[in-house]
């Protein structure tokens, strides 16, 4: 299928193929090449990835009050000459102030996590507890008489904690009643947030939303449990979408610059000879695509010891095929088969084919500038909504609230024209103040000493 994202179409491999084809590395390599063609190809222009990276870099400089002053100098230069100007070209930090106000205003957590068990067992316990408390309310006199005569307490809760009526009981159930499973669930969720430093992660996410208009995080599940990682939108790629929450994207990717020892740790099966060849090809790709204006200079040693790897997720579907066989006793037995299973349509056969399609996610790792696919496999621990187990959620959570027709707008992007006008006005005021300053007076001390006052004395510099 051809996915058109600009003037030139990008050819992605068809998804209407068998599961065996999708799991092959050739299919994964085709997906990798298509993504590289769509985002990193400079033949049709600057490339989507590089255009996005440069624009985000420009907005971040404005948000820090460190934007380029070249445009301001061009406004004041006369035929490119600035020698007659003595101005303070440092940008006025207008935008950083408002960015801090907006970001800090989004940091308050106004709500706490509250778990409410709805399973039949928990619901039964809650109902039984309410009935027991209601019984204590209705039999307060009898319970007190039993305590006085027999010295035995038959209450379900202490008398001081007993609600006075049904209204107080309802309020108590909302505020004071908690089952152990609910407390454990709340503690587990809070522990996930705490271990992943969620407040710092959220602040970076909100900062990107304000400055760039888009924010992204990635969730994974490994031996350390649930992990939430920050994703730089400048390194993020995605399939075309008009949804501000990116829920209909069928692929996401993240570009990472990793060292050779980290690559060897992630993929220990790569031979050292192949690793050396990858380094040479990868460094050439970096030298060609490096933006020396917007990126810190990278030494030749760094180029020879790092690789640019694209980690991506690809959403497709798989067919769960079962052979339903009728046994001699009349019962049915389900046997798992691959999607190539296609029995003949013969009523004399006592079995049939039953299939169900469900979404899956494939994980891949591709070295940019080469044809090397480091990883291509079906993801494990995929996230599925409890209401629809046939649907899968991507590992990336992305939001761009002000996106329209694929174009992302941020608060800072709307403020940059006004920041430029304020900066030009500031420079013009400096120029006007310099013109209003009177010219200095030069006093020739030697000439004053030669002035004859007519009384036998000469004029001196101290008297002047």
Question: What are the roles of these predicted feature ranges?
Answer:
Residues 1-357, 362:
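Extended, helix-rich architectural segments
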Residues 326-464:
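Extended, charged amphipathic alpha-helical segments
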């Amino acid at each position: 299928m051809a996915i058109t994202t600009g003037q030139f179409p990008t050819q992605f491999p068809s998804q209407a193929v068998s599961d065996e084809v999708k799991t092959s590395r050739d299919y994964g390599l085709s997906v990798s090449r298509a993504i590289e063609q769509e985002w990193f190809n400079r033949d049709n222009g600057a490339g989507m990835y590089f255009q996005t990276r440069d624009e985000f870099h420009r907005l971040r400089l404005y948000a820090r009050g460190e934007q380029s002053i070249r445009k301001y100098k061009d406004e004041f230069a006369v035929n490119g000459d600035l020698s007659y100007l003595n101005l303070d070209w440092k940008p006025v930090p207008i935008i950083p102030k408002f960015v801090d106000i907006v970001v800090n205003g989004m940091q308050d957590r106004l709500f706490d996590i509250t778990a409410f068990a709805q399973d039949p067992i928990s619901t039964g316990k809650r109902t039984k507890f309410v009935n027991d408390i209601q019984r204590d309310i209705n039999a307060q006199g009898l319970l007190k008489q039993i305590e006085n005569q027999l010295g035995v307490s038959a209450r379900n809760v202490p008398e001081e904690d007993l609600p006075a009526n049904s209204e107080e009981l309802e309020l108590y159930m909302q505020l004071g009643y908690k089952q152990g499973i609910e407390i454990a669930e709340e503690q587990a969720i809070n522990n996930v947030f705490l271990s992943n430093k969620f407040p710092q992660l959220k602040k970076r996410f909100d900062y990107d939303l304000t400055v760039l208009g888009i924010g992204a995080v990635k969730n994974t599940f490994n031996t350390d449990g649930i992990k939430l990682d920050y994703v730089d939108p400048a390194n993020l790629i995605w399939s075309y979408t008009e949804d501000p929450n990116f829920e209909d994207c069928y692929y996401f990717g993240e570009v990472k610059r990793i060292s050779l020892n980290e690559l060897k740790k992630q993929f220990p099966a790569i031979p050292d000879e192949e690793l050396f060849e990858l380094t040479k090809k990868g460094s050439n790709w970096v030298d060609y695509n490096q933006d020396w204006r917007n990126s810190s200079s990278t030494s030749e040693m760094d180029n020879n010891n790092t690789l640019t790897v694209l980690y991506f997720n690809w959403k497709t579907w798989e067919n769960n095929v079962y052979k339903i066989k009728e046994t001699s006793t009349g019962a049915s037995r389900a046997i798992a088969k691959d999607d190539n299973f296609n029995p003949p349509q013969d009523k004399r056969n006592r079995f049939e084919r039953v299939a169900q399609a469900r979404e899956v996610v494939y994980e891949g790792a591709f070295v940019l500038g080469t044809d090397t696919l480091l990883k291509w496999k079906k993801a494990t621990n995929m996230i599925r909504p409890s209401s629809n187990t046939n649907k899968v959620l991507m590992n990336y959570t992305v939001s761009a609230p002000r996106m329209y027709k694929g174009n992302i707008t941020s608060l800072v992007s709307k403020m940059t024209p006004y920041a430029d006008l304020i900066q030009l006005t500031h420079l013009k005021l400096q120029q006007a103040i310099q013109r209003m300053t009177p010219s200095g007076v030069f006093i020739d001390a030697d000439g004053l000493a030669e002035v004859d006052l007519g009384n036998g004395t000469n004029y001196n510099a101290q008297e002047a």
